[in-house]
Amino acid sequence: MSQAGMNEGHALVQVLNGTYNPSGKLTDTWAIDYKDYPASATISNNDGNSLEEFYQDDIFVGYRYFDTFGKKVAYEFGYGLSYTDFEIHTDSVEADEDQIKVSATVTNTGTADGKEVVEVYFSAPDGELDKPYQELAGYKKVEVEAGKSQKVEITFDTDDMARLSLIHISEP
């Protein structure tokens, strides 16, 4: 449990004794080794410079770096555990000029009620600009009783997939 606050002990007991089914997901990627982070060599005086920090991650921050460059990780972005199991089935993907809508069904295949996060990613085609392998476009958390299913829709704007450079290159 990370940054759980002053009630961390009470929350941990409820998770461990099964009175609460956890559903949180990691908001960052956890590398296997600190040196696996691209900025590790130049951050926090690791390069002998405590006055200036130079980030060279560019657009490849967090999961975008690890996914794009195929780095193995200890725990990926969005990782989380539960006392139940879920299956997510993509029902449809609809797109027009302005938006993309993904419809899915989340089925709780376990024996405990629980919550699951459905994540939608997109991959942009290659072009002149650097792009991560994939980017999170949207997500939604749904509560599903054991043995039941829940429909979910996630919509995002097509503009969210655009790239813009400072040398006036724009790619849809």
Predicted feature locations:
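Secreted, periplasmic, or luminal enzymes acting at the cell surface/secretory milieu
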Residues: M1-K115, K141
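Beta-strand elements of well-folded, non-transmembrane domains
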Residues: N108-G110, A124-D126, T158-D160
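Hydrophobic residues positioned within well-ordered beta-strands of beta-sheet architectures
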Residues: V102, V118, V152-I154
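Intrinsically disordered, low-complexity Pro/Gly/Ser/Thr-rich segments with frequent PxxP/GP/PP motifs
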Residues: L129-R163
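Short acidic, gly/pro-rich beta-turn/loop elements at beta-sheet edges
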Residues: V73, G114-E116, D130, A162-L164
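Short acidic, flexible loop segments centered on an aromatic residue
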Residues: A112-E128, L136
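Residue-level detector of conserved catalytic or cofactor/ligand-binding positions
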Residues: S165-P172
